[in-house]
Amino acid sequence: MTVRIAINGFGRIGRNVVRALYESGRRAEITVVAINELADAAGMAHLLKYDTSHGRFAWEVRHEREQLFVGDDVIRILHERTLADLPWRELGVDVVLDCTGVYGNQEHGEAHIAAGAKKVLFSHPGSNDLDATVVFGVNQNQLRAEHRIVSNASCTTNCIIPVIKLLDDAYGIESGTVTAIHSAMNDQQVIDAYHSDLRRTRAASQSIIPVDTKLAAGITRIFPQFNDRFEAIAVRVPTINVTAIDLSVTVKKPVKASEVNQLLQKAAQGAFHGIVDYTESPLVSIDFNHDPHSAIVDGTQTRVSGAHLIKTLVWCDNEWGFANRMLDTTLAMAAVDFRLDASASTKL
């Protein structure tokens, strides 16, 4: 059975979801029936075909009136501003992937369902009243049929949660701090211009810019036992893609850096294959562009101080890895209702 999805919002994540679907060979499992985007069809087709970060799309892309053609597939284009007016019932939509970054609470999800969708997956953390928040590879098995409105968390949460779980299971985490070194985003300015956050009034290409982050809250949403035991900060750097996360944790059991690396490498080759990767190559951020993993542990940067303080550096393609997890979570949500096999949904 094929899951019929619609995408609401065809920005960075929405377009990468479509690209990831075609590149990963999952079109027998998922089909895109519609995309709702306020921009015109010509712009949608052009930005799907040509991408500064990820290169030229291998599939033929064209548009005719309000239809987008990807290879031989036809996707209906919509330009609805009001969720209630979306024709999800008419189109037989199983799961809406809301990638606007604007909508994200239970009321918004209910609006999609009232329009005829069976389930909704938000591409950001959303509000605390959602039915579930999923970090694929860690807690997707907790999904139930009654979880209709779900968050896929954030790219940085998907990056760091698997590593935190591995370290906690092995050594017992007492507390931790996280620094997200994040590529620039479209809420920043090309040149100095007004913004409610005065730091984000400054040109993104010229400065390292501290920004607010809810990453610590994202960690405790998945692992409530860490409430008040993690803190996080974030800076934006003048690159257009790929993020590094500096994770420091104090642990109960004494450990050596070599043992930490052995643990993480084994997980990447085993239980977390396809979600976590491990490298000791002398790589830089651009080398992780278009990497489908949620997290890539840089073993050359692992440090242990006093046997109980662990520092790790974890990379992720904050667009491509997250887009692949959107597809994984979509299949996991569908599997609950439609008894699809989502166990092998992660394909590299």
Swiss-Prot record:
It is an enzyme of class 1 (oxidoreductase). GO terms for cellular component: cytoplasm. Its EC number is 1.2.1.72. The record marks H182 as: Activates thiol group during catalysis. InterPro entries: E4P_DH_bac, GlycerAld/Erythrose_P_DH, GlycerAld_3-P_DH_AS, GlycerAld_3-P_DH_cat, GlycerAld_3-P_DH_NAD(P)-bd, Glyceraldehyde-3-P_DH_1, NAD(P)-bd_dom_sf. Homotetramer. This is D-erythrose-4-phosphate dehydrogenase. It comes from Salmonella paratyphi A (strain AKU_12601). The lineage of its organism: Bacteria, Pseudomonadati, Pseudomonadota, Gammaproteobacteria, Enterobacterales.
